[in-house]
A protein has these predicted regions:
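Basic, amphipathic alpha-helical/coil surface patches used to engage anionic, phosphate-bearing ligands
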Residues: 1-400
């Protein structure tokens, strides 16, 4: 199997043959613009002279195809999608520009298509390398009303594709196409409660979307992680696999429900992972004023049938604030404070409490400290499964 490692967008770091391919493609693009080969219209009866006067500059995703520092990164995407075969890359670019014009993609960006699908696809946080993370939540279509509203007939399915393209276009325009910038998206597809393979309407829309993305949005996925993967999906994937390039498949990662949080944490820090997927991140609001996505969290593995104690040293009088969770709970949690005064006593901050999977996913506590010492957070895992403990804390000075 071919391997595709992280690739550079800095021209000086490209191998000589790839630099040559980029130079050749830029020359072909220049010639095509000079010869007006990139001027397309969605109206075949519109005079060519009028098309040209209305399009003095050829752009894609808001980026000019000539004389812009971001142009090289755009062209590299097409080259990589076609394994640096210049003619094939040029034809892909030309077909993409034609498709964008035929479907009025630039105008679609500003259309109002409603907010019915806001919970189906959304952006939240970044991965460890800085790529924005996009979540695709297929379980939302378990709602029969939403499913029919989205897929019941061809007109509705086409509208869904338009909405999905619009969402992607808006996300792409927030990327950084400068050399060395972040110009790809980390994709997460949540298959929990996803409609099964018998839902032909969803299957059709998925296949259509996949084809459109592969043909017209090359190299925009840094990684594609499927979480909460049910048994039947791997069979479905094997059916879809022939329609995907090897390059696309090399970016795929699959995680069962039991390993979802563990796999996400490999790529995304827990403070960036939404609470519903095992992380600590919620939309900032009055109910969560202490911690934000910028406050880093630690991850500790609690082995089966063991106790794990986290020690937080306190070197000043303050209010100590902490937040923690154990993914899936089924543990006991307690907290105590041990002053440094040599009297060998501890202060019970939180008596050991059994935490069930149905309890609040995240616990927040604070404790006012007048004597220097240490806070001990103890997790007792009586199960035969290892657990992931997430925690973070901050020190707030006492008022004068």
């Amino acid at each position: 199997m071919l391997s595709f490692k992280q690739e550079t967008n800095k021209i000086k770091d490209l191998p000589p043959l790839e630099q040559l391919s980029l130079t050749d493609l830029k020359h072909m693009v220049q010639q095509a613009i000079t010869n007006k080969d990139f001027y397309f219209t969605s109206n075949p009866e519109e005079p060519t002279s009028e098309i040209i006067s209305n399009h003095e500059e050829i752009t894609i995703w808001g980026i000019p195809l000539l004389k812009d520092e971001r142009t090289d990164v755009v062209l590299l995407k097409f080259l990589r999608a076609r394994e640096f075969k210049v003619n094939e890359s040029f034809n892909m670019l030309k077909n993409t520009l034609r498709w964008r014009k035929a479907f009025s993609i630039d105008e679609l960006v500003d259309e109002s298509l409603g907010d019915d699908l806001d919970k189906v696809v959304f952006m939240h946080g970044n991965d460890k390398e800085g790529h924005p993370v996009c979540y695709n939540v297929y379980g939302e279509f378990e709602n029969k009303e939403l499913y029919l509203k989205t897929f019941a007939d061809e007109e509705k399915r086409t509208r869904f594709l338009k909405w999905r393209i619009q969402f992607l276009e808006r996300s792409i325009r927030k990327l950084d196409f400068r050399p060395g910038g972040i110009s790809t998206i980390f994709q997460v597809s949540d298959l929990k409660n996803s409609p099964g393979p018998g839902k032909k309407e969803l299957r059709w829309a998925t296949k259509q979307a996949l084809q459109l993305l592969q043909d017209n949005y090359p190299e925009f996925v840094s990684k594609q992680v499927f979480i909460n993967v049910p048994w039947w999906y791997l069979a479905f994937y094997s059916m879809m696999s022939p329609f995907m390039t090897q390059r696309t498949k090399s970016k795929f990662v699959f995680a069962s429900p039991a390993r979802t949080a563990e796999v996400l944490f490999k790529y995304v820090s827990p403070e960036h992972v939404p609470i519903q997927y095992g992380g600590l991140s919620v939309d900032y609001c009055d109910c969560n004023p202490e911690f934000t996505i910028d406050d880093s969290a630690a991850v500790v593995t609690v082995k089966p049938m063991t106790k794990q104690t986290v020690e937080i040293i306190v070197n000043e009088k303050c209010t100590l604030v902490w937040e923690l969770r154990v993914v899936g709970w089924e543990v006991s949690y307690g907290a105590e404070y041990v002053p440094n005064n040599g009297d060998n006593y501890t202060i019970n901050v939180q008596k050991p409490k059994k935490m069930a999977p149905t309890d609040e996913p995240v616990i927040s506590h604070s404790y006012k400290i007048n004597e220097l010492g240490k806070l001990l957070l103890t997790i007792d895992n009586p199960t035969s499964k290892k657990k992931k403990l997430l925690y973070r804390f901050k020190v707030e000075p006492l008022p004068e």
